[in-house]
Amino acid sequence: RFKKIRRLGALPGLTSKRPRSGSDLKNQLRSGKRSQYRIRLEEKQKLRFHYGLTELQLLKYVHIAGKAKGSTGQILLQLLEMRLDNILFRLGMASTIPGARQLVNHRHILVNGRIVDIPSYRCKPRDIITTKNKQRSKALIQNFIASSPHQEELPNHLTIDPFQYKGLVNQIIDSKWIGLKINELLVVEYYSRQT
């Protein structure tokens, strides 16, 4: 993880740690001139590691975004941001996306009153995300919400009621609220050159 954030910069979905300020400068000096391919590859890897996806999963999302109307890059980011594991992370119910994925896999999370154990579940507007009524589930979420550093930075497409352990998806995310500094066009370019 630390090698990844040193090489690619801050990845809030992967870990809360930040690279040291001088390490980015050292990387640029050590590596010399960066080719266009390397720049595109690094942006793709940044997206992959932040959301915790395999290469095949990311490729699938790129194909879905390519078939939809509109900007492929923007739609790709919207698809990734509306995943259940990412929504839990953005609500502050988990400290990282892998942590949110574990909560979902262990069946602690309900969407609209039904247990969902698929982290890639695509949330829609007006979805209500809650925890199971079990004490253990509530204790896990309570710890994350209490220690969540980004509670005040909640994006406008989400609302949370920390006392009832309930989150609400208001709308599809707007591109300015995406939690990762990334040039999504470079990711789309990377995949368009691969085929």
Swiss-Prot record:
Under the heading Pfam families, the entry gives:
Ribosomal_S4, S4
Q: Does the keyword 4Fe-4S apply?
A: no
An annotated Gene Ontology molecular function: rRNA binding
Tell me the ranges covered by the S4 RNA-binding domain, including all copies.
82-143
Q: What is its main location?
A: plastid
Compartments where located: Plastid, Chloroplast
Q: Name one GO cellular component term.
A: chloroplast
Q: Which InterPro entries match?
A: Ribosomal_uS4, Ribosomal_uS4_bac-type, Ribosomal_uS4_CS, Ribosomal_uS4_N, S4_RNA-bd, S4_RNA-bd_sf
**Keyword set for this entry?**
Chloroplast, Plastid, Ribonucleoprotein, Ribosomal protein, RNA-binding, rRNA-binding
In the record, biological process GO terms are: ribosomal small subunit biogenesis; translation
What exactly does this protein do? Answer: One of the primary rRNA binding proteins, it binds directly to 16S rRNA where it nucleates assembly of the body of the 30S subunit.
Note the PANTHER family from the entry: 30S 40S RIBOSOMAL PROTEIN, SMALL RIBOSOMAL SUBUNIT PROTEIN US4M
**What family is reported?**
Belongs to the universal ribosomal protein uS4 family.
- How does this chain assemble? Part of the 30S ribosomal subunit. Contacts protein S5. The interaction surface between S4 and S5 is involved in control of translational fidelity.
Q: What is this protein called?
A: Small ribosomal subunit protein uS4c
Q: Which organism is it from?
A: Watsonia angusta
